[in-house]
Amino acid sequence: MRILITNDDGINAPGLDVLHTIATDIAGPGGEVWTVAPAFEQSGVGHCISYTHPTMISEFGPRRFAAEGSPADCVLAGLHDVLKDTPPDLILSGVNKGNNSAENTLYSGTIGAAIEAAIQGLPSIALSQYYGPGNISLDNPFEAASAHGADVIRKILAAPGAFESHPYKLFYNVNFPPVAAADVKGIRAVGQGFREGGTGMGMRADMAPNGRKFLWITGSPQNVPSGADTDATVNIDGYISVTPMRADLTAYDQLQSLKDAIE
C-alpha cells in the first residue's frame, strides 16, 4: 500500500512522527509512506488553499517534502506533483496535537487535508490526540494514538462501504482520548457534537505603544461534553471516537420545507 501523510502542525511536529509510524505499520512490508506536510504550523486554517500565490516545495529527505502552504495545499502537492504518476491508496492527516472534536472540526487544518483528499476522490482519515489532565504529563502525550492508531485505521478500512461511491466521498475523523494507552476503554462510532455553551472562540484586544490595536483569538476549556453519543463526550469518557463525514454541507433536513416555502 502507498500512503500519503500530512498534518497542520508542520513538518517537524511530533504528531507527524507518530503518524509515520502508524502509516508504516498499515502500509506493510513493501509498502510506501510519503510525507508532504506544511513547512510552518498551519493550525486553524481549515480547508483553505493558497490560490493567490504559488506553493513552494522542498525535499527534506527520502519520500519527505515540506510545502509552504496549508494542509489542503499539501494534499494537492502530493497528488499532483510528488506522486502524480503513482497516486496513493490512502491519505492520513495528523496526528494533531489537540482534539478536533465537536466544533473544532470546522476550524481544523487536519480535517481540511482529509476533506481535500476526499474531494480528490481518495480515501482519507484525520487523526487527532485529545490533550487533558490524563495525558498531558505523560512522557508521550500521544501514547493513546501511538498504541491504538493502526488498529483503528484497519477497522475503518474493513468496514462495509467505508469509502463508497458518492460525489462527496466519505472521510473519517478520529479523536484519541486524553488518557494513557492502557486506559483507553474502546472505540465508539459517534456523531459530531457541539460543546455545551457553544464555541469559545472570541477575540481579545491589545494596544501597541504606537496606538495600533491588535486582536488575538481566544479559546475556552476543551474538556467540555458535546452532547450524548457524540465525539468530545466519549473522548472525555476515555473512548476513541470515529465519525464518518462528508464535505456536502447541505442541510437535507430543511431542504423539503424550504422547497415548499419558496418554490
UniProtKB/Swiss-Prot annotation:
InterPro entries: SurE, SurE-like_Pase/nucleotidase, SurE-like_sf
Enzyme class, spelled out: hydrolase
Gene3D superfamilies linked: Survival protein SurE-like phosphatase/nucleotidase (3.40.1210.10)
GO molecular function terms noted in the UniProt entry: 3'-nucleotidase activity; 5'-nucleotidase activity; exopolyphosphatase activity; metal ion binding; nucleotide binding
Cofactor notes: Binds 1 divalent metal cation per subunit.
Domain of life: Bacteria
One GO term describing the cellular component: cytoplasm
Keyword list, A-Z: Cytoplasm, Hydrolase, Metal-binding, Nucleotide-binding
Binding site for a divalent metal cation: 8-9, 43, 96
Needed co-factor(s): a divalent metal cation
Catalysed reactions listed for this entry: a ribonucleoside 5'-phosphate + H2O = a ribonucleoside + phosphate
Record localization: Cytoplasm
The EC number(s) this enzyme carries: 3.1.3.5
Protein family membership: Belongs to the SurE nucleotidase family.
Function noted in UniProt: Nucleotidase that shows phosphatase activity on nucleoside 5'-monophosphates.
Protein's recorded name: 5'-nucleotidase SurE
Native source organism of the sequence: Jannaschia sp. (strain CCS1)
Source species taxonomy: Bacteria, Pseudomonadati, Pseudomonadota, Alphaproteobacteria, Rhodobacterales
Gene: surE
